[in-house]
Each structure stands twice: as structure tokens, then as C-alpha cells.
Amino acid sequence: YNGLPMDVAKVLVQDYLERYPAPKRMLIDITGCDRTNDELMAGFLSYSGQSFRLDTLIHNKLEKVWWGGKVSALFRYNNEIFQRALSHRNQTDAGWLLDRVISPKLATEVAQHQYPLEIHPYLLQQLREICAEAQTRGVDVRLVISPYFPQFAQNVANLDALKKAAEQATGLSVTDYSRALSDPSAFGDFMHPNIKGSKSFVDLMRNDGVLP
């Protein structure tokens, strides 16, 4: 999910591994350790009744939101997460990639846009625990940094520091694709490859053995 912080990702991964057969390989983009996202976390209140881990996380991090869900059941569903779930309920998940090309105007303004990554020890700990749990179940975990628009990666502060911190926290190497795509038409915006770029990204990961 776009903007999903690593603490929410951890409980979702733990629930998945507990309920379903473990995948052979799992890819994690370490930029999910960049920042917390309480607003997005609150949206998962819709599903807290189906996950003790999720319920506990929301209770510990957002106690007022958690109690709001106890006082009013409808409160649980007044959020973007549930609205998106309704929208996508009868649709395939095979078409979620961006189907647009970054506008020429925005592309020429790349030097004006800065993106300071943050380094959160708490979220790095969540990443470490995800990797450790998956590995105990035989999952081959690979860490990556996804591609950024050409020239934008140099505007992302602390990217190398975050990569180093993730490697130290997990003991795994991070494959950095932040500068891997040089074609501007492969992006829908500065941070998201479009369909064309995603195909190129997948090909790169296959060539590198990151994907089987």
C-alpha cells in the first residue's frame, strides 16, 4: 500500500505468514522505514477485529482512535482504506500500475523538488523483525530501493544513510535501483515508475537474481 509504514507492514506480514503458505521469496523496499504514518494506520482500524496484532498496534500507537472504534462501529469504516477496498472489491489487482507519463512541465522542474528521507530506529527494528520472522519460515528475503525519476534520486537526502542503516539492522544487503532507470517516459511522477518503467524494473531484478 502506498505510504505503508514498516510497523503496519510487519503485522500484516506476520498475519499472512501465520495464515497462508510461506512464499519462496519476499521483496521489501526499505524506504518504508522512512517515516511513520498514523493517518494511514488509523485506516486499518476497519480490519482490527480480524487481527489481534493489528488491533494491538493501533491500541498502542493511536489509543484515541482505537477507543473511537469501540464506541462507534461505523467509525471504523470512515477512512480511505475502507473506501478503497470497496472501490477495488470487484476489480482485478493486475492493473494497479500507473498508466500515465510524467508531464513535461513537472519533468523540467525536477531540480526544484527535494525529498528528505528520515531514519527511524523504531521502523528499522520493525524491518529487522519482519526479515527475521520470514527467514525462520524459509523465505528468501531481498531488500531493495525502487527506482526514482532520473536526476531525482540525487535530491533524496539520506538515501545512502538509510541503505546502510537497513543493512546493519538486518544483516542483508540492499539492492539499490534508485538510479537504475534513465528514461523519463518510464515514470508517472518522480517516485513511481509507470507500466513501461515497471516492466523495465522487473527485468532488471530478474537479471540481477533479485526476482527468480
Positions of the model-derived regions?
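Conserved SGNH/GDSL esterase-like catalytic core that processes O-acyl groups on lipids
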Residues: 1-51
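A generic secondary-structure signal
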Residues: 12-19, 129-133, 204, 208
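Active-site-proximal beta-strand/loop segments in catalytic clefts of secreted hydrolases
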Residues: 1-2, 29-31, 144-148, 177-180
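Loop/turn elements at helix/coil->beta-strand transitions in domains of secreted/extracellular proteins
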Residues: 22-25, 136-142, 170-172
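Alpha-helical scaffolding within the catalytic cores
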Residues: 11-15, 124-130, 157-161
